[in-house]
Amino acid sequence: MQIADQLRKGTTRLAVLHALESGPVYAYGLRRATRDKTAGIFDFNEGVLYPLLHSLEQDRLVSSSLRKVGGRKRRYYRLTARGRETLVRCRREWRALNKALDTILD
């Protein structure tokens, strides 16, 4: 596994929680928005995204609901209160880790 893949894998959960912060979104919309916002660095395939969303739902960080849009059913995901608290904590920890790593790399 390449170093970039390892780094990305370690931050995938944080990236998905952050993407859900702006409101409910269905999986493909989440994938597209994250890919576009990160210039393709985070481009989750279904084999990564759906199990992660399921895990976040089991941990009660995310909830989901089915909606009919244009005649098709889509599952929309949103952060729960617990998910928002976790996101705040993860951001704080990420920024501290990133700051510490910057001091090593400089």
Where are these regions (language model features)?
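Beta-hairpin "wing" of winged helix-turn-helix
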Residues: 57-73, 78
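Amphipathic alpha-helical dimerization/coiled-coil segments
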Residues: 85-106
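Short, hydrophobic-biased segments on the C-terminal half of alpha helices
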Residues: 50-55
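Short beta-strand/turn micro-motifs at beta-sheet edges
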Residues: 2-6, 65-66
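Short, conserved catalytic or interaction motifs in soluble domains
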Residues: 22, 58, 99
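Basic, amphipathic "hinge/linker" alpha-helix immediately C-terminal to the N-terminal HTH DNA-binding motif
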Residues: 72-91
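N-terminal helix-turn-helix DNA-binding core of bacterial DNA-binding proteins
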Residues: 5-48
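Absolute protein N-terminus
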Residues: 1-2, 106
